[in-house]
């Protein structure tokens, strides 16, 4: 029933508890599910007695009642371009911006920590959040210890392109090196500051357009980096890559275990509701430990009710009065309602380019 629903509606998304990686390991060891928040965010472990680390072998993690205080994203292609233009080491410039994000997160924790529990009695006084049994005049700082804060990354494909003119499909080695470096630094910051920092694959619904404008303003139009009105979200291959669903799963698996603060993997199914194909790819994704989305371009005619994948004109009645549903990044969204788009122009351009998204 689940596969049948996904192949017709693109929901539900699928979370592996039996495969590889962080989420499955929490379930296998503790019987705890790390449920995704929103379209892709995951909480880091917080243990009942030990906090950031287990007090002993019997200590168990808690995920219910916790939250994320926000994500701040690195503009990786721009950081690389800045380092090159100023003849600086890329990692030196990257360190500067990572430290900047770190200080912003610390400031956010400090600012929120001064708030009184009375600002949200249901969450902070009546047990809505973990530890939320404070008095109305108590400050909420103790509750924030179990809250995560994310270092986001976008445009990893464009970083690889600006580095050596190759995409993540063609190469990807530099991108892997950078992600390993960022992940290591985030973990160091976490231990030093005592806050639950995590690395997050930013969906960048609007940021993907803003970052292009920022890049062009300083460094102009660079082929395969800033020549489109959008950049790739998080660690995904470029949407225009003519690759198979299996190839896309394998290519993105390289980055999967480095981004435990937030991630989703999805492929486009050009298979016209082929249930067996969808099921096969979903089972493969579960074996690989993915949080997997099924991507179709769902369309239906508002005049005659005809449904079809990815139509712009109804073949039955000739109407352009269509409703279309596409995956925005992690969420589903109406790319057309009664013939008109509800998405930003840069996002609509990305949707037009999709072959393997």
Where are the model-predicted features located?
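Contiguous, well-ordered alpha-helical segments that form the cores/surfaces of helical PPI scaffolds
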Residues: 149-162, 180
């Amino acid at each position: 029933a689940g596969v049948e629903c996904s192949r017709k509606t693109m929901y539900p998304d699928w979370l592996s508890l039996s495969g590889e990686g962080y989420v499955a390991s929490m379930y296998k060891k503790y019987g705890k599910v790390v449920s995704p928040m929103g379209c892709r965010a995951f909480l880091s472990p917080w243990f009942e007695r030990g906090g950031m680390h287990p007090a002993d072998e019997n200590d168990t993690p808690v995920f219910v009642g916790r939250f994320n205080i926000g994500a701040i994203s690195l503009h990786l292609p721009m950081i690389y371009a800045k380092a090159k233009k100023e003849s600086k080491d890329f990692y030196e410039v990257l360190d500067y911006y990572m430290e900047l994000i770190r200080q912003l997160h610390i400031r956010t924790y400090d600012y929120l920590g001064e708030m009184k529990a009375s600002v949200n009695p249901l969450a902070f006084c009546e047990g809505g959040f973990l530890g939320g049994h404070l008095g109305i005049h108590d400050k909420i700082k103790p509750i924030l210890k179990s809250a995560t804060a994310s270092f986001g990354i976008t445009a990893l494909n464009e970083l690889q392109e600006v580095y050596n003119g190759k995409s993540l499909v063609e190469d990807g080695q530099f991108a892997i090196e950078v992600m390993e470096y960022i992940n290591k630094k985030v973990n160091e910051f976490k231990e030093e500051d005592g806050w639950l920092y995590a690395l997050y694959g930013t969906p960048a619904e609007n940021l993907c357009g803003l970052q292009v404008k920022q890049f062009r303003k300083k460094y102009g139009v660079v082929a395969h980096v800033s020549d489109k009105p959008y950049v790739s979200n998080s660690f995904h291959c470029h949407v225009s890559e003519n690759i198979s669903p299996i190839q896309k799963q394998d290519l993105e698996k390289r980055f999967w275990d480095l981004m435990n603060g937030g991630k989703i993997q999805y492929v486009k199914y050009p298979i016209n509701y082929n249930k067996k194909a969808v099921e096969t790819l979903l089972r493969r994704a579960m074996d690989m430990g993915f949080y997997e989305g099924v991507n179709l371009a769902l369309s239906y005619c508002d005049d005659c009710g005809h449904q079809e994948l990815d139509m712009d004109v109804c073949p039955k009645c000739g109407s352009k009065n269509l409703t279309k549903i596409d995956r925005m990044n992690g969420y589903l969204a109406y790319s057309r309602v009664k013939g008109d788009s509800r998405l930003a122009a840069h996002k609509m351009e990305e949707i037009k380019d999709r072959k393997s998204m």
